[in-house]
């Protein structure tokens, strides 16, 4: 009987993950798996558990949760030959979506059996990841300081922190929204309405500031950072927003979206097109291209790129967590992890 190790975040979706796990577990056993469950207890715990399992005899290590849990488990397995499976019961589930795995609809999971079937007979794909380095974001009374994980490797610059991205890296209005959410702003509002309220607050509170960007081996350029940028290996993030339309995990590079110099009205107006994937080219200010390396810095008083962080702080999301700030660097590395997904995946 094949053994499967499942790593569950019991706090995902305010505890709904535990209830849905109660449906998944018997389905896994019925499929012929010997199930071993590991519950996480604190941020980064899933990475530690996954790393300890990376050389074990389990057929597959399964992340049970959303994109945050997937990120932690993938970080722990990265560089090994152990296969990562996904049972998506978080709020975003974009990495599962990119691998053709069925996802929940609200609080219901109509094709839960389909997700289990992929664990049994899905296709294993070897994919890359981005190494991301920058200063760690400072904590908040409701957010602990991000911690260094030895499995991520050491930074090249003293005081920096390293994370690996399997889904996407973004900054701008999107990371400001995520940071405010984590700080507990509008916590009495639930669902998509909360993100709408956070987005409006972030946009109207946005202060224009320049930024310097260097893509691959091209000369650096200065932009007005009113908007966002996103380096992604998948088509969607934020729970289905098609931010980098056409991207897929086995493409062998990142898809870089840049939306700079937007007015506050344009930032509000772009949210609908972002969800549908019809935003590229709008107002002549939104572009998308392939890239494998990116540097982002503030601009000093002399008009040159600076080693200082932006002021006010520009947070950088790595797979949905606002853990870093500028100056930031990222580089794509091939052959980092094996993912079990559907026989065919979107855009491949």
Per-region residue spans from a language model:
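Glycine-rich beta-strand-to-loop/alpha-helix junction loops that act as flexible
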Residues: 10, 64-66, 87-91
């Amino acid at each position: 009987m094949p053994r499967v190790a499942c790593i569950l975040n019991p706090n995902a979706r305010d505890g709904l993950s535990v209830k849905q796990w109660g449906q998944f577990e018997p389905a896994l056993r019925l499929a012929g798996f010997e199930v071993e469950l590991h519950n996480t207890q604190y941020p980064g715990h899933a990475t530690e558990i996954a790393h300890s399992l990376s050389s074990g005899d389990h057929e597959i290590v399964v992340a049970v949760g959303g994109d945050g849990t997937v990120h932690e488990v993938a970080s722990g397995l990265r560089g090994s030959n152990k296969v990562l499976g996904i049972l998506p019961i978080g709020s975003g589930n974009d990495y599962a979506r990119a691998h053709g795995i069925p996802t929940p609809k609200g609080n219901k999971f109509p094709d839960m059996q389909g997700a289990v079937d992929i664990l049994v007979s899905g296709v294993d794909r070897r994919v890359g990841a981005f190494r991301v380095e920058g200063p760690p974001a400072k904590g908040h009374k409701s957010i602990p300081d991000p911690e260094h994980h030895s499995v991520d490797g050491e930074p090249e610059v003293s005081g920096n922190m390293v994370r690996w991205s399997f889904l996407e890296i973004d900054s701008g209005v999107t990371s400001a929204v995520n940071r405010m959410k984590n700080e507990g702003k509008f916590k009495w509002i639930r669902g998509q309405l909360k993100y709408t309220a956070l987005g409006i607050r972030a946009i109207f509170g946005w202060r224009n500031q320049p930024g310097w960007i260097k893509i691959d081996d091209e000369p650096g350029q200065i932009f007005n950072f009113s908007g966002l940028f996103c380096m992604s290996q998948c088509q969607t993030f934020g729970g289905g927003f098609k931010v980098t339309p056409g991207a897929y995990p086995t493409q062998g590079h990142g898809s870089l979206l840049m939306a700079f110099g937007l007015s506050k009205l344009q930032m509000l107006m772009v949210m609908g097109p972002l969800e549908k994937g019809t935003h590229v080219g709008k107002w002549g200010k939104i572009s998308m291209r392939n890239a494998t390396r990116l540097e982002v810095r503030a601009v000093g008083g002399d008009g040159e790129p600076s080693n200082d962080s932006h002021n006010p702080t520009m947070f950088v999301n790595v797979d949905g967590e606002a853990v870093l700030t500028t100056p930031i660097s990222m580089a794509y590395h091939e052959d980092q992890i094996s993912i079990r997904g559907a026989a065919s995946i979107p855009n491949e």
